[in-house]
From Swiss-Prot:
Role according to the record: Photoreceptor required for image-forming vision at low light intensity. Required for photoreceptor cell viability after birth. Light-induced isomerization of 11-cis to all-trans retinal triggers a conformational change that activates signaling via G-proteins. Subsequent receptor phosphorylation mediates displacement of the bound G-protein alpha subunit by arrestin and terminates signaling.
Compositional bias annotation for Low complexity: 334-354
Domain of life of the organism encoding this protein: Eukaryota
Phylogenetic placement of the source organism: Eukaryota, Metazoa, Chordata, Craniata, Vertebrata
The protein's name in its UniProt record: Rhodopsin
Site (Plays an important role in the conformation switch to the active conformation): 113
Sequence segments annotated as region (Disordered): 332-354
InterPro entries referenced in this protein's UniProt entry, alphabetically: GPCR_opsins, GPCR_Rhodpsn, GPCR_Rhodpsn_7TM, Opsin, Retinal_BS, Rhodopsin, Rhodopsin_N
Species this chain originates from: Lithobates pipiens
Amino acid sequence: MNGTEGPNFYIPMSNKTGVVRSPFDYPQYYLAEPWKYSVLAAYMFLLILLGLPINFMTLYVTIQHKKLRTPLNYILLNLGVCNHFMVLCGFTITMYTSLHGYFVFGQTGCYFEGFFATLGGEIALWSLVVLAIERYIVVCKPMSNFRFGENHAMMGVAFTWIMALACAVPPLFGWSRYIPEGMQCSCGVDYYTLKPEVNNESFVIYMFVVHFLIPLIIISFCYGRLVCTVKEAAAQQQESATTQKAEKEVTRMVIIMVIFFLICWVPYAYVAFYIFTHQGSEFGPIFMTVPAFFAKSSAIYNPVIYIMLNKQFRNCMITTLCCGKNPFGDDDASSAATSKTEATSVSTSQVSPA
């Protein structure tokens, strides 16, 4: 056994020398030098410094401009809300515990931080699934007469919360548990032990299949079909410069979405799955800390990718920041056209990214 398992924690270090202590009571500087904990705290402070204003601006601009309250933007707004959960209820706690070198808020605080971090991440993930399905239905038209309306958007938002709660709530009630991970200053689902008392093995399998693999398959399928549909439309309308431009824009958008999704979650999921399938193997605290903390950056680039690349939202944001005037003079009509994706044929208004 290359780790030390306690009643409510797992330290990735053998206790042969007797130095291992509970991460709820003592600094964990035997796992890593104090300066490394300071780096984590500084990193979390940077995420808070960037995440709060970006996500606040997302919510504020949407509230200020009625034309942004479209069905599609409800899902984008949901991303902003869940990112706030991650920043306010997760990042602030992690920054504070990193400064102290251990999880100073005890087991209750660990469950609190782990729950909200998981909830925020899962809401974001399932929001991306709903976005992918919406893009697929509107652009590829598997149902010819279907129009994505406000009721569908609200159902999509409710769906993201239901699925997120289905992942984040069970550890609170005895199906798995939240424990400190990596350098022991942030909490997550227990991938480190089988812990039969809380049926940990079945929960981890359920989480990987239902809350990671299935969303990834859905997103890949929807955006793959979207790219094919756009290419077919461009081939049929070769003289249309606007369609060709729209094809490039949506292809770029899809590539950015897929790449950043993979960059954000695959390293964390891979490391967690490796640890779970290699119980008792030797690994250092940094092995889990780096991907876990990097995944938290999704609260920053999610709004950048899914909202800042939305031309209509971007124009409204500039107008808000510039006290009601847009110095760049972008035409709202063109912005509005990009959001009307329910037209009867695949055209610029359908394949634009917003």
